[in-house]
Amino acid sequence: MEQETQNQHVVPQVHLKSFLGKDKKKLSCLNINKLRIEKDQSPSRICSGRFHYAEIPGLSDEYGQEAEIAFGVIEDWYGKNKGKIEEKLINKERLTDGEKYDLSFLISNFLFRGYSHREDTLHFSKKMLDEITDGLDKDVTINGISQEDAYKEVEKTSYATNQAFRDGLANALTHKKWEVLINLNEKYKFITSDEPVIQYVPDFAKKWPMFSTSYVVMTQLFHLSPKVAIVATFQPNHEGEWDFIDVTNKVDKIFESNLKYINYSYKYAYADSDHFFQKLIDFESKKRNQDTQ
């Protein structure tokens, strides 16, 4: 095996660095659960873990190193093309089909290599195995595999990581309607987090409990940079359409998009400054005070 990469990033540094303020080397950081501003963080020291992509995180293995190399290829493309894509979108210019597919692959890759997807996959796999083995004697095998080995198998993270490379997920994104939010506001910019791409159930789909949480129906939100947000929505009658919306002077729209990151990220949010974070903390504090009166 070639030289190992021990510190493996879940969110690429090339993405985090684009959210740095001018002449700044660290990002403002919000602890989402505690709604507390933490000390500023360097992109090189966050959103990563020792042998994170190994099948058993923390332990070196060949799978984790191969995943790291594959992610590196994607990140190299991102670093080389991000500026051009951002400029096009700010100028309300549609991407070519090739550019849109490549960016869609990146978006789905970011989503399915994330903390939340891994946690959800591990939880679902264990829950499913619990249901299969419920009431079985310990010596009963499952397709010739002992129950002990079966539980060891579902603890592997590769089942979650592998989905980050599925072409079909990227292809599905290209067929959605893309709303591009353009934000040139110098004070309130788009934020990012330990989940560079988030997804959520759109309001219209909440009445479809069987389908609302499917990847196709859910809305994917990607803050490409402090200036550009991409909202990929399921709208069958508007498949593949583009809509460019300038939100520079619409602070409520900027806050709405940022709040989605607060609500659907893993643990931490990051930005070039703490303007939005402080505004959010003040709002929640005021709300609590009103509720107690």
Predicted features, each with a name:
Residues 1-7, 11-293:
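Alpha-helical structural context detector biased toward long hydrophobic helices
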